[in-house]
């Protein structure tokens, strides 16, 4: 399992396919994923090691409602502020596009590639076709909680400049979530006929809450 964060940042084209260049100077996590891909594909080319590389994007489940920026206590800290009627930090102006994928939808694509001869030596993206702005993402959470969405917009650069010790907002934002991305999963759908992510984010987040 690799990561969609491994794709080139800043993005050259917001439309992302498996052929998009890999390079992320902002996030060590992503560079480590790229290095692992290189090792595995080398083993496939030189010794026939059967490898399939998966690049997911922000897969989530009922255990945690995913957000862009949170404190040491995770996303529940953000939800607590919402319930208290307080504003929440939204990076940038909240207009960049992002993709969230419900874990059961990811699993359908993943299982469809297991033992699939079309998958050997290949790379696949597994994620939802739904693209949402961060404003829409946070508003979905607020709606699920039954409270108003009160954004407090802060530039990613300022968040990075003032981050507490132990945080890596440069990687998390500039290297990942602050970029507008739209993923093309047509390759996966050719290899796994019938694959379709069916759980929309607003439905998934209600399962979390």
Protein language model annotation of sequence segments:
Residues 1-4, 54-56:
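SDR active-site strand-loop-helix element
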Residues 31, 101, 132, 183, ...:
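Residue-level signal for the nucleotide or nucleotide-sugar donor/cofactor binding architecture
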Residues 24-53, 62:
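Active-site Tyr-X1-5-Lys
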Residues 112-173, 185-186, 190-191, 206-209:
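Mid/C-terminal beta-alpha module of Rossmann-like enzyme folds, strongest
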Residues 46-97, 141:
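NAD(P)-dependent short-chain dehydrogenase/reductase
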Residues 4-14, 28, 59-63:
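Conserved catalytic-site region of short-chain dehydrogenase/reductase
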Residues 97, 177-180:
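Glycine/small-residue-rich pyrophosphate-binding loop that anchors the diphosphate of NDP-sugar donors
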Residues 70-78, 91-114, 121-122, 136, ...:
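Substrate-positioning beta->alpha
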